[in-house]
């Protein structure tokens, strides 16, 4: 059993944020959880005799001070029909910070202890209610940053990844069974149909899962979009437009943004990490120079750069330098802003004649929202190489633990195929096949070490 959760006692934790809110949920689990909780519940006799999966109304009682603490609704579960597989009580109370403290304190005085992060999910795993892929999916649902990431996590919660891993494992097991028959009964291998094709098929399926991790990284980590340009060109206004709220300071004074500001937004299910950089210019002091150096570094690392130019003014020296060095750069979108003002024809003509790819140049007015739809379409086009079209039923690997085990299994399969080609002894083939099966079993938790379980579940939320 895991070192983190070595006691099979009664546990309690707040399952909702510790904030003032309309309602909160306090969950508990353990063999004696119902009888212990009934001591602080007004309708205790009905609770002790109630069937599982029932709801009860009453009050939390502070018996020492002979007073009511809160009016609550209690959800009662009896083993094995609960998330943890144990008797369990969930209290729905008013979301008062003071009330939450009082109720949990009464739980602790009644013999419960505070649960560790992830301990409820760990008990569910021990009770075989979920496998490790489902446990990880629960955490992914909670921390999903985009609608796409959320939907993919829900798909895994339904058991899709477990089924896929189990299917591959059964293919290897069928191969191992055939080889074992040959070894156990010493029959001629010509009399046995050794399913070598199952190993080849498993190799293909494992490679698909491994490649899917790259898709997840793009979904989870997002695409870096940097706003650059000379001071007062409209970068901060565009930044706020993307976010649909004010995060950057917008003023008529040049150089308002001295460093960079970071935020994120979602477009078509893709997460964008947005940076509003310090305006490119000759800095007068050390702090400004540092900010501009950071801006230049971000521009180099970005997936996409929107370079904003004030089309109502003359080009700055920094505009000219940037255009000259990036006129053929496919990841730069030149945006001529402020078309609501009088257009500086020399600025427009110079930019149009300098930028080699005219499709990477658009004119907009952030103030009047003119050309903004075109801007979004351009962004979609320019990051198309980063986008991966996936369906909600697709299986995506999302944890470093899973990808490490899949890569290990894939390496073992390549080694097994090499040995098959070299016609090595069947006992060596059987050993390798067994290693692959164990490796796949670690992904689902059928084979697992205490250290792996400790490391995985301690990263969960308290109350999960």
Curated annotation (Swiss-Prot):
GTP binds at residues 232-237, 251-257, 276-279. Binds 1 potassium ion per subunit. SUPFAM superfamilies: P-loop containing nucleoside triphosphate hydrolases, TrmE connector domain. Its cofactor is K(+). GO terms for biological process: tRNA methylation; tRNA wobble uridine modification. (6S)-5-formyl-5,6,7,8-tetrahydrofolate binds at residues 27, 90, 129, 464. The keyword Nucleotide-binding applies. It is found in: Cytoplasm. One of its GO terms (cellular component) is cytosol. One of its GO terms (molecular function) is GTP binding. This is tRNA modification GTPase MnmE. It comes from Borreliella afzelii (strain PKo).
